[in-house]
């Protein structure tokens, strides 16, 4: 149903009953006089009488949907957040804590209102605070590859273009994600099965606007239409929410793409994009930008952070680490646009109990649910099975929309099936699947992906016999999950049972006296493993298993030091603290045997000599007697770092450079010591956070010759700022909250690159030399570059020339800028720096955008025998900017690029 509107006044649809009132904090008071609405004749799907009928049907559907909806309120949970001015329905299930507001309605409430969802119960996906907008102040800019760039006010948008009104179902790509998270945690939060809603949207055609602005031809590069919202978000170091669609979609009249300014007969609510948002029927919600400010026609797809790092379905073997390392986010074939086929059982609801008695067994029980598909494809069939897919029952469909004039369907439909109660009593599971007109259907089993998106496997409801009342039996129904952090669901039970079974399995410790040793596995004592602590033979112990990592020394991303620092020891805790699931799987390739565990921990075969550990022998000498023995004083070390050991360092000062950047100064164990960190290498900070060891690598910004202390410049990643990382940075937040005077363990040195002075490097132990250095950094990756530059500039006899290109999201994100600019002025013949930011303020004198070949050719030295490139930054920057552009410049990337 694509009904057009011919109202001569901009008002709510006649006859629509609203029992809630929009919050006037985002509207003028009194309500403004809106311009008249023109008729979109091109959108007509039938004659005038049919159009009037369609408009009448829409009004009736909205009226029905808005029945029995309580008023929205200022929710106490929003107090103290940037959204404390927005009224919201208190029944909405919050999925990401207090803020940002991401929510879905309880599934029974969603279905109670039928085809049209009341605005207060429409699911919400916000990445940050809701912008405070005013109709009169708002403009939408259309720019890029158009012949007539234009900035439209809201009144002009409504006045100059014909408006149309149509129902559209919106679905979050994460709908049903919690089912995926029960199998394996994705990087997304727990959407249930109510991340779907349907509204009647009124707006102006995007196609008409682009025509008015005279969009360029395809041959001139006008291939993509980018949308940018107004909210300020943390993603990528600070950005707007932006994404894009192909020109063909934007200009296709059958697609019904509109810029919407009304929802269910009212101006948009703040959470849904007031005053204007994009609606792309049949697409995922993530493409429908809210609080729309800019439309940019471009040759390439949108380069925004959220366009690449959100709304992708990557192959199941790709985890977050691999996606970053290998640039999976940027592969176009994994982007999500159109919705896939899906269906859900809504009746019976979760934990519903159906009593089994003479009355209930005399009539059938009606199963109900919803289904939808994408791209305008009609749902043609929904089927239910009670026997695991052996047989299927075809359901009745209730499709309350008419297709548009091109035969497209944009809304969900409802399905129902009557079944005998005794048949339900005999089944263990009810499952549903849907089909669309392209014969797409749902897979039987869940297919995991790292973002947990587009989950559309069979929706299964489990049944169990219960006793609701004395002398009576019944059937209790369980849905797979409950949304957010709510407990419940058969998948949660099964996961808990699996963990319990694993925990209850007997754990057999290998003992020298055990008759059950595995004779097929080599056994090693701790003393034997300790001997393998050199580059010629580097063994480690993790969870009682012995690994020979010698052949991996040259391949370790962090350099051989990362392994050698733990060689010959049990490093279980440290390994767990810093390695991903992928690394843990790789470790199995290097397993050579098992550790022999005994009742004591001494290397000796006699327990009488054991002074520490788990010994139960009562005759051991107390430790205190040994520690009071007269021992010669140990010689004082000139450097603090001891390989393979942690040293305690005291936090003596913390200085705030900006709202999220700190300088931390740590005192060394002795005031006359140097840290002992070679230039180019880094250290680990070690702390117990939330009961677990946390280790993070940092490069000090203080000089290597400083005595008694070292300094770190650290960007603090706060909890609740980035929706994809709601917990923030564990170590950076720990440092920020650490009381002055507290001790922190430090371990090092680590790294495969060492600058030995005057153009000389040791890389994996091999000598390299350069007179000119091309230095590329992104974000916090500036610190190792800074460390090398600092060492060079401190030596007046070091004539190495440095050319730095430093990329950030915004100018405010640039770390150590004052120091870098000072060096560039003081040592203009030896040190040059050029900044690149994605978005810039007026008057910015450096590059805007990304690190391109042009930027690198202009500001870095040419390739040659006397040039080396140094880089440290996010993996996509290294893979897609640094590597290919250096190759184009003639650098031998394999040999002449040193990546920290």
UniProtKB/Swiss-Prot annotation:
Q: Look up the EC number in the record and give it.
A: 1.7.1.1
How is the cofactor bound here? Answer: Binds 1 FAD.
Q: What is the protein's species of origin?
A: Lotus japonicus
Per UniProt, heme binds at 556, 579
In what residue span(s) does the FAD-binding FR-type domain sit? 644-756
Alphabetized InterPro entries for the sequence: Cbr1-like_FAD-bd_dom, Cyt_B5-like_heme/steroid-bd, Cyt_B5-like_heme/steroid_sf, Cyt_B5_heme-BS, FAD-bd_FR_type, Flavoprot_Pyr_Nucl_cyt_Rdtase, FNR_nucleotide-bd, Ig_E-set
Say what the protein does.
Nitrate reductase is a key enzyme involved in the first step of nitrate assimilation in plants, fungi and bacteria.
Keyword Heme included in the entry's annotation: yes
Q: Which family does it belong to?
A: Belongs to the nitrate reductase family.
Residue span(s) of domain Cytochrome b5 heme-binding = 521-596
Where is FAD bound in this sequence? 696-699, 713-718, 725, 730-732, 783
Would the keyword Iron be found if you checked this record's keyword annotation? yes
- Residues binding Mo-molybdopterin: 172
Q: What is the name listed in the Swiss-Prot or TrEMBL entry for this protein?
A: Nitrate reductase [NADH]
Q: Example GO molecular function term? A: nitrate reductase (NADH) activity
